[in-house]
Design a protein with these regions (language model features):
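Metal-cofactor-binding active-site regions of metalloenzymes
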Residues: 1-190, 199-204, 211, 216, ...
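Short HxH-centered metal-ligating active-site micro-motif
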Residues: 195
Length: 335
């Protein structure tokens, strides 16, 4: 019963890496088209490879997979495939992260990436009435200077990029390392999102809030270790994009039963659910809702609250938010 409700409720997805939505079939197809040699020759072999042990082994696989993204058409096909799937799950708006630096270092131009992805946005809006924004993420294992160079390129595409973000390996890469580039990004008018408190300590969440002035925090599960931080997040209603299946697959938490999402929700935090890297974790947004619900016994009211939070936490303009919130409330009133 709750799974049917999850499937039908309008929602936004706010933390999804486009490179992480690369399904095995498309990976093989793009590798063949671009003459990229892969260590796999079949979809089955890729599916076996997608069973990883931890964040580092996952990132190795993830970085190898994205080598097949070369031309604008590749980014277009990948993005359109994700948006088709998201629309089928009643995602009405998506905010899609991409790792520009990982592509730039392979000689792919920023314009190539953005042209492909925004063309998919336009087509998806027309075909399935799903809207989308782009978030350009800086890789935190690289330098702040490297991030700043990309930011200066991104300014040319300000109309196509809603926000900048910070992702990749968290440990020993504190948010404060990127203060200057985030200050500059805000001056240019970008929203800011920061992944923090996944495998990094609660202190990184404080830094994301106070040093980088993040509009939204990704993962953030370790906030429950710090009561003062929980109070702060509650008072400020800072949106948190939680990826439950990712957290279990990467062993950030031992099991879904031990996931702190329910506690965060009960304590009034502004939590939303996203898929992170759906192709690698075998779970898009609805599967994330369903897996969390099975372990945490969500009521319809909980699911509604998180769907509402997802629209409120988006970077859509107010009129579009209001329209989607109205659609959500109309749906909820009829169940």
């Amino acid at each position: 019963m709750i799974n049917e409700f999850i499937a039908k409720i309008p929602k936004a997805e706010l933390l999804v890496h486009i490179e992480g939505s690369l399904e095995p079939e498309l990976l093989l197809q793009l590798a063949q088209r671009n003459k990229i040699k892969l260590p796999y020759s079949s979809v089955e072999q890729i599916k076996v490879a997608y069973q990883f042990k931890n964040l580092r082994s996952f990132l190795d696989l993830y970085n190898a997979g994205m080598q097949v993204l070369v031309k604008s058409e590749d980014f277009y096909e990948l993005t359109l495939a994700y948006l088709r799937k998201a629309a089928s799950q009643n995602v009405r708006h998506a905010e899609i992260s991409f790792d520009a630096q990982a592509h730039l270092e392979r000689g792919v131009k920023l314009e190539t990436m953005i042209m492909g992805m925004t063309r998919a946005f336009q087509e998806a809006q027309k075909e399935w009435q799903i809207s989308a924004n782009l978030i350009l993420c800086f890789l935190r294992n690289l330098t702040e200077d490297a991030a700043q160079k990309v930011l200066l390129q991104a300014v040319e595409f300000k109309d196509s990029i809603a926000a900048v973000g910070l992702d990749s390996v968290e440990m020993n890469n504190p948010p404060e390392k990127f203060k200057a580039v985030f200050d500059l990004a805000r001056e240019y008018g970008f929203y800011t999102v920061v992944s923090a408190g996944e495998d990094g300590p609660p202190e990184y969440i404080w830094q994301a809030l106070d040093v980088l002035k993040a509009s939204r925090i990704g993962y953030a599960v370790r906030c429950v270790e710090d009561p003062d931080l929980m109070n702060r997040l509650n008072l400020t209603a800072t949106p948190l994009t939680i990826c439950p299946v990712s957290n279990v697959k990467l062993q950030v938490v031992k099991s879904m039963q031990q996931h702190p999402l329910k506690k965060m929700l009960e304590q009034g935090l502004c939590v939303t659910i996203s898929s992170d890297d759906p192709a690698y974790f075998g779970a898009y947004v609805n599967e994330n809702f369903s897996a969390a619900s099975a372990a945490m016994k969500f009521r319809k009211a909980d699911v509604y609250e998180m769907a509402k939070n997802s629209f409120l936490a988006s970077f859509l303009e107010s009129s579009k938010k209001e329209k989607l919130l109205s659609e959500l409330d109309k749906f909820y009133a009829q169940v």
